[in-house]
């Protein structure tokens, strides 16, 4: 077993029962191993595409095979693959590279796929001109609490063409005419993972006596 790469002269000496010897020499070339390495998208939310970039190097040959294992039962032989995970979680990703001397090396890294927040809200039914209160009841996904982010942004669209609400989880708005309005809320957590939800808010017409 050679501990270093290089060119070695191997000698085989054989001796028979009469003490006679013979020998043979051969040149043994020990190549350096390729060094597997890769990078990937920093923050990945469920549904995002994860891009992997091969950073492997080899000083004594050419890498000609890439074996990726994404840790969820899916694989690829592309140099720079991409993958979409079906579930949040922590995945062990491996890249094994092989060069034209059949030398191999493996790199292993952890990829975290974060869950998107669960978006929801409530609203009071009011009459025209009154103020309705919109309350975000959105939460982080408790099933994946160890990797889920904390919601820190709320984007409201009141559905009446009068712009967007302030970045608050509880907000008030007055509608100038009756009807159902489709209100949209987008919540975003500290990792940039977001979810959108829409629901109807009802504004009643005034009764004229």
Report each predicted region and the residues it spans.
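Short beta-strand segments of immunoglobulin-like
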Residues: 39-44, 121-127
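Short, exposed coil/turn segments at beta-strand boundaries within extracellular/luminal domains
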Residues: 17-23, 75, 101-106, 164-165, ...
